[in-house]
From Swiss-Prot:
Statement: the UniProt record of this protein carries the keyword Disulfide bond: yes
GO biological process, alphabetically ordered: activation of protein kinase C activity; adipose tissue development; adult feeding behavior; angiogenesis; aorta development; bile acid metabolic process; bone growth; bone mineralization involved in bone maturation
Protein name (database record): Leptin
Disulfide bonds: 117-167
Function: Key player in the regulation of energy balance and body weight control. Once released into the circulation, has central and peripheral effects by binding LEPR, found in many tissues, which results in the activation of several major signaling pathways. In the hypothalamus, acts as an appetite-regulating factor that induces a decrease in food intake and an increase in energy consumption by inducing anorexinogenic factors and suppressing orexigenic neuropeptides, also regulates bone mass and secretion of hypothalamo-pituitary-adrenal hormones.
Name of the coding gene: Lep
Amino acid sequence: MCWRPLCRFLWLWSYLSYVQAVPIHKVQDDTKTLIKTIVTRINDISHTQSVSARQRVTGLDFIPGLHPILSLSKMDQTLAVYQQILTSLPSQNVLQIAHDLENLRDLLHLLAFSKSCSLPQTRGLQKPESLDGVLEASLYSTEVVALSRLQGSLQDILQQLDLSPEC
């Protein structure tokens, strides 16, 4: 009889019995830190300072605006739209921000799971119909407006996380 697999299993079992779950406040702190990091990345892109998040730009109505009260579900949906818009932009400025948004959404899913919420699957959202046409006509404006509104939305999400948002 071969004892090696049994020994490996027992060694792994002893290790797993000491592993503890990450406290939810740690996940919430990581979420806030990532939001602040994304906001800093947006601030580092100099041309985003020229447009207000509240400014209306014709043809860019599909970019989410500010929402005063956000549930975890609404936060995730909003970030999914921004992620989709940013990944459609050819600019290298927004590539890391798009990846950060995916990580932020994963953290929001962990927060929702800790509250026994199940967030709807938003990974396969369809691209807004007008996005391709707008990108072709005004790539620069789309990037500036999207980043400006994303920054405002992230500030709202940061405030809502302190209020322990609902599902």
